[in-house]
Amino acid sequence: MTVKNISTRAQICGRSANCHGGHSAVEQASYIGRVKMYSEYDGHTYYPKYSEDLVHSEVMLPPNAPSEFKDPTRLWNSVELSEKQSNAQLARTFRVELPNEWSYELAVEVMKDFVQRNFVDKGMCAEFAIHDSENKKNGQRNLHSHILLTLRSLDDEGHWMPKQKKVYILDENGDRIPLIDKKTGMQKVDKQNRKQWKCSTVCTNDWGNK
């Protein structure tokens, strides 16, 4: 049994008004885990509106993640504090609609496998929760899952890596290409008199392309 044909919806959680997956990773974790959580970034304590529909919640980590990240409060506060920009993207959220005829045991088993294979095995830290609520429009059962994913990679020591890195553009011989000043025809130097080379910025992971 897989979630291959089950409806999913992905959004970005971030500080920008254009992010539709929430504006605080801690708030989102509080919501899906149905627990009170304090945000060290904004000083707010987030309270879940209700918790009766919570079936299961769990944090899943890659091998290089600190064991303390098993605590969702520690994980998502670390995510928040690693981002300095006022418009930073913080996390990716998924809502997965599950078949209402599934048992809780099957739902947990399938979602753990789905999260492990698609996200954790690629290096992401993930929290998922399963809710069993009532559809307010038709009164029917609404079994579904929420997933919250990190956007930054972790290095071998368990520290957050930059989302992007600078790489030098090389010529056909594999050598760096000088950055030439059009006015002087000479290679540019910075304020420390260091030579400048053509470069570009690339993402440190390809998670945003999936």
Task: Tell me what each language-model feature is.
Residues 1-210:
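N-terminal nicking endonuclease/strand-transfer module with a His-rich metal-binding environment
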